[in-house]
């Protein structure tokens, strides 16, 4: 089958023919329709330090997808051939304390689809049926293909009550932009998004941000004054992994504020812990999606009128995958879709 493979321990990705995966007793065989390129895929493409320490070569990459069930193991229940599905890319063990307690997203033995097991950038994917999620008929293939990063946005944004709150989002990557759309949709008051990428900030504005701030040109405090904010932000969503952005967030939080952190900072980050202690801030780390509460929330948000369509800015045939990776790497895109049909 046609697959995108990290075939060499160097920059790049290669379209190759690989064997069709075998289906286990509890697995689904999914024929891929569309996939989306993730920031993780760009790390793997660029072969950075994280990738060199994490990715087995060769491996089929990719974990954002939608497809159709075309086969299943004999023990599978609840699915039928022809079902349209996406799926949770974190494959969990089922036997650790968190898994047995129902906190599956906190499994310490998690494997990643397209990271350390074969991924979705292929004509066919096999995953445990437990990890698959049926896509409602009124949600398009394009939107279904980005459920994985949309789930990161939903998990982060809905970690704390947002109704009537002022929300600061640092980092206008696709996940930060989708988080802004979610926050506004569920009733946040002011949703302010910071970054230094004008293209992405304009996209955030289209997706519902009250105000976008290019912090290389504007002062966040001036924007807060402009919005009539006298007490700081109630909720912070740190999506950038940039230390100076996190420090600025701590500085601008109201007393009793809550921060959800999805962005991954460098190993050593200096933090003024006095801001955390004396303001009584709560900081929560976010990894992936809650299984499967986040998935049901994603479907419900879209069915209740949340419009994510502007975040998908480019679509390429899989044969033009290089254009897709170049576009994603340019910083002048939202989500980039690869069409396998």
UniProtKB/Swiss-Prot annotation:
Localization in the cell? Cytoplasm
Task: Write down the SMART domains for this protein, in alphabetical order.
Answer: PKS_ER
The organism's superkingdom is given as Bacteria
* Reaction it catalyzes: L-threonine + NAD(+) = (2S)-2-amino-3-oxobutanoate + NADH + H(+)
Give the annotated active site: 40 (charge relay system), 43 (charge relay system)
Which cysteines bridge via disulfide bonds? none
Q: What is its EC number?
A: 1.1.1.103
Which GO terms of type biological process are on file? L-threonine catabolic process to glycine
Cofactor comment: Binds 2 Zn(2+) ions per subunit.
Q: What class of enzyme is it?
A: oxidoreductase
Keyword Cytoplasm in record:
yes
Residue(s) at site: Important for catalytic activity for the proton relay mechanism but does not participate directly in the coordination of zinc atom:
148
Listed PROSITE patterns: ADH_ZINC
Q: Name one GO molecular function term.
A: L-threonine 3-dehydrogenase activity
* Keywords, ordered alphabetically: Cytoplasm, Metal-binding, NAD, Oxidoreductase, Zinc
InterPro entries assigned = ADH-like_C (IPR013149), ADH-like_N (IPR013154), ADH_Zn_CS (IPR002328), GroES-like_sf (IPR011032), L-Threonine_3-DHase (IPR004627), NAD(P)-bd_dom_sf (IPR036291), PKS_ER (IPR020843), Zn_alcohol_dh (IPR050129)
Which positions in this protein are listed as binding NAD(+)?
175, 195, 200, 262-264, 286-287
Q: Which cofactors, by name?
A: Zn(2+)
Q: Where along this sequence does the record place binding of Zn(2+) 1?
A: 38, 63-64
Q: How does it assemble?
A: Homotetramer.
Known NCBIfam families for this protein?
PRK05396.1 (NF003808), tdh (TIGR00692)
As for family, the record states: Belongs to the zinc-containing alcohol dehydrogenase family.
Cited function: Catalyzes the NAD(+)-dependent oxidation of L-threonine to 2-amino-3-ketobutyrate.
Q: What is this protein called?
A: L-threonine 3-dehydrogenase
Q: Organism classification, top ranks?
A: Bacteria, Pseudomonadati, Pseudomonadota, Gammaproteobacteria, Alteromonadales
């Amino acid at each position: 089958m046609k697959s995108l493979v990290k075939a060499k321990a160097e920059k790049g990705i290669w379209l190759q023919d690989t064997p069709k995966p075998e289906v286990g007793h509890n697995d689904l065989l999914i024929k891929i329709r569309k996939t989306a390129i993730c920031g993780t895929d760009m790390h793997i493409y660029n072969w950075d330090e994280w990738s060199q320490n994490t990715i087995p070569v060769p491996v089929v990459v990719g974990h954002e997808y939608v497809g159709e069930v075309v086969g299943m193991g004999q023990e599978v229940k609840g699915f039928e051939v022809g079902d349209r599905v996406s799926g949770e890319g974190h494959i969990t063990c089922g036997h650790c304390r968190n898994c047995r307690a129902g906190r599956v997203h906190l499994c310490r033995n998690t494997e990643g689809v397209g990271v350390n097991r074969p991924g979705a950038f292929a004509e066919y994917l096999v995953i445990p049926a437990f990890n698959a999620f049926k896509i409602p008929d009124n949600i398009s293939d394009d939107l279904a293909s980005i459920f994985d990063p949309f789930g990161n946005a939903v998990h982060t944004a809905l970690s704390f009550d947002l109704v009537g709150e002022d929300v600061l989002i640092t980092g206008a990557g696709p996940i930060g932009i989708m988080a802004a759309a979610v926050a506004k949709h569920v009733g946040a008051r002011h949703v302010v998004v910071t970054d230094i990428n004008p293209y992405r900030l304009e996209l955030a504005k289209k997706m519902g941000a009250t105000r976008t701030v290019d912090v290389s040109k504007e002062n966040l405090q001036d924007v807060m004054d402009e919005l009539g904010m006298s007490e700081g932000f109630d909720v912070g969503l740190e999506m950038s992994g940039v230390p100076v952005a996190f420090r600025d967030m701590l500085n601008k939080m109201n007393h009793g504020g809550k921060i959800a952190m999805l962005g991954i900072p460098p190993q050593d980050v200096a933090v003024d812990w006095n801001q955390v202690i004396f303001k009584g801030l709560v900081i929560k780390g976010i990894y992936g999606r809650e299984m499967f509460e986040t998935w049901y929330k994603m479907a419900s948000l879209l069915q209740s009128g949340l419009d994510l369509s502007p975040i998908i800015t480019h679509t390429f045939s899989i044969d033009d995958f290089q254009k897709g990776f170049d576009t994603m790497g340019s910083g002048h895109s939202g989500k980039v879709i690869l069409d396998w049909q």
